[in-house]
Amino acid sequence: MYGQVERKRVNFGKITNLDYLPNLIQIQKRSFDWFLQADVKDETKRRHQGLEAVFRETFPIESPNNDMIMEYSHYILGEPKRSPQECKDTDATFAMPLKAVIRLIIKETGEIREQTVYMGDLPVMTEQGTFIINGAERVVVSQLHRSPGIFFSYDMERDVFSARVIPYRGSWLEFEMDNKGILIAKIDRKKKFPATLLVKSLGHGTNEEVLRLFYSSKKEKIAGATSKDLKKILGRRTINDIINMETGEVMLEAGSKINEDNISILKEMKVKEVELIEFPKGKDNPILINALEKDGVNDYEDAILKFHSLMRQGEPSTIENATTELTRLFFSPKTFDLGEVGRYKINSKFEFNNPKEFSGEKARVLRPADIIETVRYILNLFSETENYYPDDIDHLGNRRIRSVGELISNQLKTGFSRVERVIKERMTVQEIETQTPQLLISIKPITAVINEFFGSSQLSQFMDQTNPLAELTHKRRLNALGPGGLSRDRAGMEVRDVHYSHYGRMCPIETPEGPNIGLILSMSSYARVNDYGFLETPYRTVKNGKVTGQIEHLTADKEEYHYIAQASGVIDEKGELKNKLISTRHRGDFPFRNPSEIQYMDLAPLQVVSVSTALIPFLEHDDANRALMGSNMQRQAVPLLREEAPFVGTGMETRAAYDSRICIVNKHDGVVTSVDAENIVVERKGGKESDTYQLTKFKKTNQGTCFNQKPIVGVVHSEINGKVSKVSKEKIEVTGENGELKEYVLQIGSKQYSPIVSAGEEVKRGSTLAGQVVVGEKLDEMGNILVKGTVLADGPAVDNGVLALGRNVLAAFMPWEGYNFEDAILISERIVRDDVFSSIHIEEFEIQARETKLGPEQITRDIPNLSDKAFRDLDETGVIRIGAEVKPGDILVGMVTPKGETDLTPEYKLLHSIFGEKAKDVRDSSLRMPNGFEGTVIDIKRFSRENQDELPAGVEEMVKVFVARKRKLLVGDKMAGRHGNKGVVARVMAEEDMPYMEDGTPLDIVLNPLGVPSRMNLGQIFETQLGFAASKLGISFETPVFDGAEESDVDNFCKEANLPLNSKFKLYDGRTGLPFMNEVFCGYIYILKLAHLVEDKIHARSTGPYSLVTQQPLGGKAQFGGQRLGEMEVWALEAYGASHTLQELLTIKSDDMLGRARIYEAIVKGIHSIKPGIPESFNVLVQELRGLALDIIITDSEGNTVDISDYEDEYSKSKKKIKFETIENA
């Protein structure tokens, strides 16, 4: 606004540079652009990825009898029918129509029938990286799953290695050693067979061929060898069969061990030399030879037939069938797909040892070479050969990200495969002459999978919109659960734990507490996802000990081989690393290295942590557990009525608010020409075009908080009527009608204004003289920000473009009369009175008028049997007026529903026949304000078929009522700082009774000092002290994570502000005026109000619903339930011998149906009597025992058998009056 000066900001960061931060919601937007390729100008030249790949993999489709073929040309995207805001208002999906150009070619005639076929509506991502599905904003969370490829693992308990080939789609192949020392293969975790059978089926038929494939050999002389030489070959194995030339008999099979008997036989046969296997490291390793003995075949044909009979038991085995089966399992693109990632992982695994076969390979199916190389690798692992290591399954090189685009295309593949089946069926059924692509294609399976994925998939989530940070974090979340991921129950400690490869890729701090810990994670602030779906983090390159300006992004795999210096390494003016030995990171270790041995250096200290953790000042002084709570609780902060940026921040606040896209950002350079509460108009440079930005006012978010945008740019208005006398870059002068001169300065702080009027122009009071100069946003092709645009309007929880989740309040750390015992908080009445922590909450109530069998429901003011008071705020149509104050039970929308004739009693029917009173054939089904809600009606939206609004089937009219309510801070509300220091308001104290400082300033909030030492979150102490200096000096501080203010910096600013270095002050008791015994630590701390408001939780039941089976009251506020009296409470009452109280609680106050009816009557009639009956849960128990075939007999006190069911029925049938024994008050 004009005339408003911004607070000066002091940044303590020495190395943190936020300019290198990627666009924080890039992961969502890039992935969806990859999928849709909407920006490609020529639709026929889209890349083979995402949606295009789905079409290309489904088509062409040939008819079963080969007489026609259906081909795909390209797809066309239409325009969305409604804007995102309209979709939210009408509960519609923000989607664009998808059409595809399909050709049907009749083979016999060569005729081509081409049509543009509508393939359904595809939900589209909004500017903010969200989807609007049925009017609700949703986010598709990225999934962290095990990457396709080949993995070698080591089982410590059994001391064996195993290999696993995991494809993107298709059969799993595993190799491992069984208990008998045989190398076995498993397909799809089911069929086990010797691994050599698979190798032989690939064309290496004999034992000798298999051995030569994996081992080298050496010839050793036998004829003429000395006994010493012959001793050396004892225990070695032959690589080939040794055959008696005369008889043709195999004397020694390939792989046989040579012993003394064999040597004498060989001498007898006059064998001159034998070829022996050279095992790695000379250790005999028989696992392959054991498998060769077990497989029992010695040529290719036998091997492949045996393989087929194992895989397809009971089917006739022919060479052709067997080859087809093997191809189907691993070598056919239709049934087996490694994906680009799987192939990339296999290549990178084997390239080092076999570059000829594996560098630059592109095949997405397995090749025989892949299987053979896998077997070779596992044999080398068993032989402990150098450069052969098992993989770490939790390493981020073996886990990848599936983002939105990939998740949607996987779903569409399922839909399209169903479509393919339908097309083939229809091709055979319909006549060729009449067939067209439109008639053959059914889009139902496609729309079904899209709706199912967006509506009910575990990864498509209702967006957390509590505040901008919650929204941003939700889009950057990584989820290891979901289809194809882990399950909560089976995930062990190792998967959940922090791994060294997470550094700079996934935040080690931000994860939920509870069963999902370590399974739901957040991306680190600088991390990005590469084309293969692996997380990368940026590093500055170091060459010959000198830090270059180059930045390289490394995946976890690539980082393995390098030594990386930390960002805080000391660098001189030339960019060279100063110290002789530098602390580096290498895999999970921290060795010291010379500068010449270092290849990379961290970019910034905060690259380790996520955005919300990077918002915690002095994070380095907090314990990790509390930092985790602090990160999570910032996401629960409610946007307040008056936002205030923190006095002590980290510098990340501006970027978090900007990238959350909750503010309005200017798109083109220009000048603001007009500003009001709903629109901002910016005239572009050159003055030919102007852009109008519409502000969102008081809309409900998913969590019921208030979304409201406020302009922060301005124009200069004339304050007088007169004439512009002078215009320059610095100022505008206006001479008034009475000759007075008014000056308007055009540079205020960082804001520059540009004149819109010229000298000599007549101006009226309120005329626009100048507009603020604004910068347009510029992005690169990756979506990263090159130039930040000017923020035109703040969103919720944003103050002047800076994220502002809470308020700065004057706090003291001292115990006060026990009101802050155990994390409770004592606050001043001023905070409530001045609306410091007040927030606006909006609730939406909806009613639909439907067409019923008995006639339509009607929204009307004419409701039977109600007093005039109930209608006082309804308009003539029966809808409440905007501005009305509503309380529980008030009518929001009047509606009547036709009543069925069956409902009428005989007396009513008689009245009808006499008076013909048909008007009362309706019952009241109005929308009323539910219990526990009150507020002011701020908006009403009406939709009806008459106005051509789209409504669900059977709905004639729909009304939505929005009720807003200002919530002040109450006792019981949860509040928290940014360091995991949470508590509940215990008392709101009169301002004059609060402790006050020597100058008479009363405190706003009193916290318990005992909450600090055991929790080790000292960040709050530093923040409080620096906050006081900021308040006194009128500036704001930025102290970046791990690169912030040191103690000396804090001390220097305290001196400047004339504050004591220990920040301790003499305080006086507000009630007595006497000073407290000790000085107290005081300062300004940033406190948030969390979304756990006491009003939403407090609840009391009068009369409510009962469970159908047990007849006990339901539980929970939503069901208007009762308070559970559990077994421990029963024990407590038993311990006190309170038998009557206990009996009453277990029977008439709970599930004794007869007793409930009686007690009601007794209360109405004023009779002081209670006679408990049998609780319904006892009947349920009896029936359950009878269900177990146990005959249960119940007897009364006199030994007579009581039939419970009769006992009840008698009561309900006769409805006889119950006699009450009146107890006289003697």
UniProtKB/Swiss-Prot annotation:
It holds the Pfam family RNA_pol_Rpb2_2. One of its GO terms (cellular component) is DNA-directed RNA polymerase complex. The keyword Transcription applies. It is an enzyme of class 2 (transferase). SUPFAM superfamilies: beta and beta-prime subunits of DNA dependent RNA-polymerase. GO terms for molecular function: DNA binding; DNA-directed RNA polymerase activity; ribonucleoside binding. One of its GO terms (biological process) is DNA-templated transcription. Its EC number is 2.7.7.6. Keywords: DNA-directed RNA polymerase, Nucleotidyltransferase, Transcription, Transferase. Signal peptide: none annotated. PROSITE patterns: RNA_POL_BETA. It comes from the Bacteria. The RNAP catalytic core consists of 2 alpha, 1 beta, 1 beta' and 1 omega subunit. When a sigma factor is associated with the core the holoenzyme is formed, which can initiate transcription. NCBIfam families: rpoB. DNA-dependent RNA polymerase catalyzes the transcription of DNA into RNA using the four ribonucleoside triphosphates as substrates. Belongs to the RNA polymerase beta chain family. This is DNA-directed RNA polymerase subunit beta. It comes from Leptospira interrogans serogroup Icterohaemorrhagiae serovar Lai (strain 56601).
